[in-house]
């Protein structure tokens, strides 16, 4: 069952797309959008998680704004104009809403993010170690100038990066992985050979959709989340 819901966000209100599994209950997973906004591809990912037994919530970090998949300039403008503090509040509020929802089970909240959402998934994991226990970022991570205080990060991170990615380079992913491993964090950032940025995205806006790789990765994501959250 899918619905648009509202939730408190630090004295204000935000909205999101909530999908429950057929049984109505399961562990909670936050799904964080790409730079386009809360689009059909992100809703599809939430639905796929629900089909695998999770209660999935994708918060609308652009508060109703949306770029079409051929509007890259608009998508970039939306991403760069999004107030970081508001996005942090919205993600945190979404996590609390999800954790308190009837039917959400398990030991904590999982986070899956794509592109911009991959980057943000690292940030919310570092900010909310009290709730976030498992993170799967896809082709996105914070650049050095945006890195948070990693000291409180306790979630297990299993990231999936692209080999050919000018937005989030494999070299940057390797450097971040080495840094976090050096701090004793449980993290792996796998670079998938032959892939380009957004290789999981069904909209295929960059012409980089790789269905073969996606078919291998997705069951791993589901198994990882069940292992950490059930």
Where are these regions (language model features)?
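N-terminal cap/leader regions of alpha/beta-hydrolase-fold enzymes
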Residues: 1-230
């Amino acid at each position: 069952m899918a619905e648009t819901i509202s939730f408190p966000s630090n004295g204000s209100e935000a909205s999101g797309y909530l999908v429950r599994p057929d049984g109505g209950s399961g562990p909670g997973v936050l799904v964080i959008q790409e730079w386009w906004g809360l689009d059909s591809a992100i809703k599809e990912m939430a639905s796929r998680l629900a089909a695998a037994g999770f209660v999935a919530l994708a918060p609308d970090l652009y508060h109703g704004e949306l770029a079409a998949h051929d509007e890259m300039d608009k998508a970039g403008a939306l991403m760069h104009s999004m107030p970081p503090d508001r996005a942090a509040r919205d993600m945190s509020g979404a996590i609390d809403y999800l954790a308190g929802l009837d039917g959400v089970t398990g030991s904590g909240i999982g986070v899956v993010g794509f592109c911009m959402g991959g980057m943000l998934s690292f940030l919310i994991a570092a900010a909310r170690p009290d709730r976030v226990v498992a993170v799967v970022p896809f082709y996105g991570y914070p650049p050095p100038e945006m890195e948070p205080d990693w000291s409180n990060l306790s979630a297990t991170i299993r990231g999936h990066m692209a080999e050919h990615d000018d937005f989030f380079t494999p070299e940057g992913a390797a450097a971040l992985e080495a840094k976090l491993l050096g701090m004793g964090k449980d993290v792996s950032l796998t670079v998938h050979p032959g892939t380009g940025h957004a290789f999981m995205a069904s909209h295929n806006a960059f012409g980089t959709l790789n269905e073969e790789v996606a078919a291998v990765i997705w069951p791993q994501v589901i198994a990882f989340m069940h292992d950490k959250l059930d």
